[in-house]
Amino acid sequence: MGMDVYGLNPQTTTERPKRPNNKDYQSEEWDRYFEKLNEYQNENVGTYFRNNVWWWRPLWDYVYQLNDDILTEEDHELGHSNSGHEITEAQCEVICKRLTEALDNGETEEYKKGYYLALENLPLVKCDTCEGVGERNDQYVQ
């Protein structure tokens, strides 16, 4: 599972590709469409961002930490779900500015180090699924 973030009013320089009409999702037509869609998204920053749920949650927590004066607790809570919650263009502009500053001044790197340190220091818990080895090897993954 992952989180998908779409820009509501992104500045684009190219036209978004049209979806094929056929239902054969394994066809070369669909393959070409997805290639073109990836190109479009890479060329038009702000149209789409995706992250798996394990990386999205800490990222969104960090965004909230930097922006808790412009984001509500409801924004924070709903930002952890795939509910389609929207924030304003003004909020997005402030978030972008602050994230860029935090990346440039090293604050994000420090946050990352602290996050990984916290993960390393989590207590071990008994796991009946993997029997404590950290890898699942049952009928669901074989």
Predicted regions and their residues:
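Acidic (Asp/Glu-rich) sequence patches and key acidic residues
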Residues: 1-142
